[in-house]
């Protein structure tokens, strides 16, 4: 019988394990601060727990609408209009089980083999894995504490190639906690338009 590993798809064989999965390495240290996942240290609000419990008792324990609950979709559209002053069609609101699942699906939807997506480092460890499993290439633009984690336009321009398809933005940033102000975003707009880049944002925080 051939080795078990040979049954595993090559895209997974060639993918490095994420930091959060390297339990042997983590076990060697006693003072590790886990910045890999945004798992809050407070209990979910009673109103949410009570509502979920009440809905479960009422029978809402089965598969729902595959496109997501219509009330939830309407709420997302309303929030987009309130927060960003942008109308959003319900047909453009897919709902996923988590932001990580959503980002993985976006990568699969937009990246062809060899396409590049640029991320600003440091970044959440899953971004690279998701891009590579979709057949893409993850390019990094470094940011530094000594510069207030600011995005350097020259570094960004230098990282863009003819295969660059998307720019990934995640602020407040995990793990640095950096915030991108409105004027910082505005500086990126000419570069994005010049190179016709898709912008993917992770706004979990």
What is each residue range found by the language model?
Residues 2, 7-98, 105:
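N-terminal small-domain helix-loop-helix segment of the aminotransferase-like
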Residues 27, 57, 111, 160-161, ...:
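Residue-level signal for alpha-helix termini/capping positions
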Residues 29, 134, 194-195:
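Helix C-cap/helix->beta junction micro-motif
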Residues 87-93, 113-116, 163:
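Short acidic capping loops at alpha-helix termini that bridge into adjacent secondary structure
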Residues 109-131:
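Conserved PLP-anchoring active-site segment centered on the Schiff-base-forming lysine
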Residues 133-139:
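A short helix-loop-beta submotif of the ANL/AMP-binding
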Residues 139, 145-205:
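Active-site phosphate-binding strand-loop segment of PLP-dependent enzymes
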């Amino acid at each position: 019988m051939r080795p078990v590993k040979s049954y595993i798809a090559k895209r997974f064989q060639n993918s490095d394990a994420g930091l959060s999965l390297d339990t042997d390495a983590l076990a060697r240290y006693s003072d590790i601060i886990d910045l890999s996942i945004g798992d809050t240290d407070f209990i979910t609000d009673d109103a949410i727990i009570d509502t979920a419990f009440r809905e479960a008792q009422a029978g809402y324990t089965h598969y729902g609408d595959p496109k997501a609950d219509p009330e939830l979709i309407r709420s997302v559209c309303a929030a987009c209009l309130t927060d960003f002053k942008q109308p959003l069609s319900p047909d453009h609101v897919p709902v996923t089980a988590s932001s990580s699942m959503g980002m993985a699906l976006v990568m699969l939807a937009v990246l062809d083999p060899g396409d590049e997506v640029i991320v600003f480092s440091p970044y959440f460890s899953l971004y690279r894995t998701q891009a590579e499993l979709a057949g893409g290439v993850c390019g990094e633009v470094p940011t530094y504490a000594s510069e207030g984690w600011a995005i350097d336009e020259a570094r960004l321009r230098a990282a863009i190639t003819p295969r660059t398809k998307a720019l990934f933005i995640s602020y407040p940033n995990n793990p640095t906690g950096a915030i991108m102000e409105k004027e910082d975003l505005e500086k990126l707009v000419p570069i994005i338009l010049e190179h016709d880049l898709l912008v993917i944002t992770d706004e979990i925080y």
